[in-house]
């Protein structure tokens, strides 16, 4: 069990607009205005990015309260990192599954995520802080997606909801186990 009082939020996955990495830092900075004893750990990389693109993401997240963690080599290393954090934050516009989020649940960690896309197959108001999504927009990031479909529109209202869910975690759930998340994760295996 963790013994320090600092709240550590966590995100992992490929650096992408689709995963909400363009807005997560702003929501985190809003949290910092109300509680300076917080950190955001980012275990993100994207092997398909150019060095310039990778630097752009690293620079966006260059902040004394943000820790950029290199990609873990094994599942045990991923778990060891997840065991040190308090809450996963996944403000995704679209997902194929969002395995990292489910792994956080399996570790008993609380999660905050968008109420949109594939992870709604296992995220509920009982096991996740769900950010309301009221609209979609053409999926466009200028690299991978060029408007072929739609994804969640994350505007000022959704960013505020993300920040509020992060603060709600600190005020109401810090130090508790996401038992509903553990029960959800038990329903999934590599066999099904």
Predicted regions and their residues:
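Short alpha-helical segment that forms part of, or immediately flanks, the ligand-binding pocket
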Residues: 79, 101-109, 117-121
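A charged, aromatic-enriched C-terminal amphipathic alpha-helix characteristic of glycosyltransferases
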Residues: 155-161, 174-192
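Conserved donor-binding/catalytic core segment of Leloir-type glycosyltransferases
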Residues: 2-19, 25-28, 40-41
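Nucleotide-activated donor-binding/catalytic signature segment of Leloir-type glycosyltransferases, i.e.
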Residues: 51-76
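Short alpha-helical donor nucleotide-sugar binding micro-motif in glycosyltransferases
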Residues: 79-85
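Aromatic "clamp/platform" in nucleotide-sugar-dependent glycosyltransferases that forms part
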Residues: 93
